[in-house]
Swiss-Prot record:
<comment type="pathway">
    <text>Amino-acid biosynthesis; L-histidine biosynthesis; L-histidine from 5-phospho-alpha-D-ribose 1-diphosphate: step 7/9.</text>
</comment>
<dbReference type="Pfam" id="PF00155">
    <property type="entry name" value="Aminotran_1_2"/>
</dbReference>
<comment type="similarity">
    <text>Belongs to the class-II pyridoxal-phosphate-dependent aminotransferase family. Histidinol-phosphate aminotransferase subfamily.</text>
</comment>
<keyword id="KW-0028">Amino-acid biosynthesis</keyword>
<dbReference type="InterPro" id="IPR015424">
    <property type="entry name" value="PyrdxlP-dep_Trfase"/>
</dbReference>
<keyword id="KW-0032">Aminotransferase</keyword>
<dbReference type="InterPro" id="IPR015422">
    <property type="entry name" value="PyrdxlP-dep_Trfase_small"/>
</dbReference>
<feature type="modified residue" description="N6-(pyridoxal phosphate)lysine">
    <location>
        <position position="234"/>
    </location>
</feature>
<keyword id="KW-0368">Histidine biosynthesis</keyword>
<dbReference type="InterPro" id="IPR005861">
    <property type="entry name" value="HisP_aminotrans"/>
</dbReference>
<keyword id="KW-0808">Transferase</keyword>
<keyword id="KW-0663">Pyridoxal phosphate</keyword>
<protein>
    <recommendedName>
        <fullName>Histidinol-phosphate aminotransferase</fullName>
        <ecNumber>2.6.1.9</ecNumber>
    </recommendedName>
</protein>
<dbReference type="GO" id="GO:0030170">
    <property type="term" value="F:pyridoxal phosphate binding"/>
</dbReference>
<comment type="subunit">
    <text>Homodimer.</text>
</comment>
<dbReference type="InterPro" id="IPR015421">
    <property type="entry name" value="PyrdxlP-dep_Trfase_major"/>
</dbReference>
<dbReference type="InterPro" id="IPR004839">
    <property type="entry name" value="Aminotransferase_I/II_large"/>
</dbReference>
Amino acid sequence: MTDTTLAPEVTLSDLPLREELRGESAYGAPQLNVSVRLNTNENPYPPSEALIADLVETVRATATELNRYPERDSVELRDALADYITHQTGVQVTRENLWAANGSNEVLQQLLQAFGGPGRKALGFQPSYSMHPILSKGTQTEFIAIPRGADFRIDMDAALAAIEEHVPDIIFVTTPNNPTGDITSLADIEKIINAAPGIVIVDEAYAEFSPSPSATTLITRYPAKLVVSRTMSKAFDFAGGRLGYFVAAPAFIEAVMLVRLPYHLSALSQAAATVALRHRDDTLATVAKLSSERIRVAARLEELGYTQVPSESNFIFFGKFTDQHTAWEAFLDRGVLIRDVGVSGHLRVTIGLPEENDSFLAAAAEISGLNL
């Protein structure tokens, strides 16, 4: 095989790219070969042997029909998701309330395709999930960033004023928030929904780590305005499987069916996610371990003099640094990869295995005396 790249002389600036994409950078966390990787909020525990065995057999059976297109509407998977949501949140739902796609990013993209677009606006409270503005731009939806308060929580007075001023078609609320880990109460979410002229997407990617009630409990009260998005990439130990979903009134599922690509979710993805849901009790048992480790790590960071936002997730947002990127490099020099999310003076660390957390804390202890 040749290792000569075809047409390398053509650069991005030579292409007739959409003007609003010029100068932008592609999304992506650093993927570096280091001993301790605590930068992408994955569940560090591998799948159970029982899950792997079940997956192998299920994929083997599925492979006999790979010459055929997959089940178009993911009915079996949506049934399994509905059963999970019913038990996890206490809200009775059916497959008609569930939609699944390739990670929550595709779920959010489909919602933006259906409810955003040219001439429409999305609004979010920053810092928050960095893909919200990126997905908005990709769908030609204007994104309006409203700063959070000094404590990184949503300033409700400012939020309601911004909604009145900008009249957004879509509002994003991430709870627990990424990268800060704090939650937005149901009472505040209701205030936002009541003020919203369009739809509200509550991003609950990390909901399993929080004891707070899910926004799905509000769907019957606001069926035409509320969508709750979730993922199997975090607590579910299924980041490599790429499966996201949302819970909403059936009309929202009808809406995204208008924009989804045909057969968007492969037969293998559907089969693997259904297997993961069958073994959810084993997998979600790791949530308690990670929550306990989060408490331990947070306590030690406090002892070392770091500030942090109280977290109900599997990560901690901490500081305060004079130059957070220099501090990020200092952790990397010590073999620990964490995340610089671009927020001045702060970094984010994923909670890993106990020994990984010990390595992080050892590095944090050394760095605390460097005045970075």
